[in-house]
Design a protein with these regions (language model features):
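FIC/Doc superfamily catalytic core
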Residues: 1-370
Length: 370
């Protein structure tokens, strides 16, 4: 343990954290208004549009939660896996690998079964799904169990030999007892505002740091579980991890400040709620894209569009990565280059696509605005 540094879990009274409710009462009111607006907007969607919005939100949550830790997941692979595991239709490009399937299973279990009790075995199964090889990178780790050993669990940054220690977690021998208290509180605490409870839970879990690795990802999965309980639905239409990623430096800064401070965690809760508000605002704006897709197909219901064209057009609305060109077209549809060019020219003639770029092989195409 670093001399002179007293972490939150070392204070008498831990884990009974404190906060000033008046400090974020206005933010809570704004969040609840936004939640109502978002669910009201989504309720205007048809069944297909609701599924599309949920698919996009869950894909973002999974991809961006991993990216917070510096891990890059293939977006199309994640989206295909989410769609398949939820039984949704999606015209994707890629089959998912075993690892991606496991990562997606963890998130789906959390949100689809948010009302089920949380126990150690459930967390262990999630951990095993995140580390199917028993390794984190090239390092062998203990999978599916609380961390063990005498070595201190530290959060560090910087080059080897010049590391900066941001945080040191409780000793491994204390994890079992601390997690028992945490799990009991997780399922029995019902007096707190559910969003405040989610913020407190987030800090509490990462402070214990119960696993050898993957603590951040599992913590954000637990956050989604509690948000699903708060919303009283397994339908996810916003992504908190996307906003955390946008403010990653602040995320780690506020966590570190809370972990190195006393039991008053008001600043952390306020930051968490402000970030949740941003996530809801971003999600509400994105519902415009879903409505845009619906308006597009309504406006073109009498236009002759073949299956190849329909497939690519839907992908353009559903979060197509990069720019569309004829090469991507024939790869997506497994057709010839000539067929791809004919399909594209046909959509240009019908006023649906327009060319951009320099022309020739570098020509890209985008949707014409309605």
């Amino acid at each position: 343990m670093m001399r002179g540094t007293k972490y939150i879990w070392q204070h008498e009274g831990w884990p009974h954290m404190q906060w000033d409710d008046t400090s974020f009462s206005n933010i809570l009111a704004e969040i609840n208004l936004l939640r109502g607006k978002l669910l009201g907007r989504v309720s205007m969607f048809g069944f297909e549009e609701q599924n599309l919005s949920m698919l996009e939100s869950m894909t973002q949550e999974i991809v961006h939660s991993a990216k917070i830790e510096g891990e890059e997941l293939n977006r199309d692979s994640v989206r295909s896996s989410v769609a398949r595991q939820l039984g949704l239709e999606y015209e994707g490009l890629k089959n998912s690998d075993h690892y991606t399937e496991g990562v997606v299973q963890v998130m789906i279990d959390a949100v689809q079964h948010h009302d089920m009790p949380l126990d150690a075995e459930r967390l262990f199964s999630w951990h095993a799904a995140l580390f199917p090889t028993g390794r984190s990178g090239i390092h062998k780790i203990l999978v599916g169990d609380w961390r063990q050993g005498e070595e201190p669990m530290q959060v560090v940054s910087g080059p080897l030999g010049h590391e900066k220690i941001h945080y040191e977690a409780p000793a491994s021998k204390d994890v079992l007892g601390m997690m028992s208290d945490f799990l009991y509180w997780f399922d029995t605490e019902n007096t707190l505002d559910p969003l405040v409870k989610t913020a407190v839970m987030h800090l509490w879990f990462v402070t214990i740091h119960p696993f050898d690795d993957g603590n951040g990802r599992i913590c954000r999965t637990l956050t989604e579980l509690l948000l699903s309980r708060a919303d009283q639905t397994s339908q996810r239409y916003y992504s908190l991890s996307s906003e955390i990623l946008n403010h990653r430096k602040d995320y780690y800064q506020y966590l570190e400040q809370a972990q190195k401070g006393g039991l008053d965690v008001t600043p952390w809760i306020r930051w968490f709620l402000q970030t949740l508000k941003l996530a809801l605002e971003a999600a509400f704006e994105k519902t415009e894209g879903v409505l845009r897709k619906s308006r597009f197909w309504d406006a073109h219901r009498s236009v002759s569009i073949n299956e190849r064209q329909r497939k690519v057009l839907n992908m353009l609305f559903d979060g197509f990565e990069g720019k569309l060109n004829s090469s991507k077209w024939y790869k997506i549809n497994h057709c010839s280059q000539d067929t791809a060019n004919r399909d594209i020219r046909d959509l240009i003639a019908k006023g649906i696509l327009k060319p951009t770029g320099e022309g020739g092989r570098s020509t890209n195409y985008e949707l014409v605005s309605l």
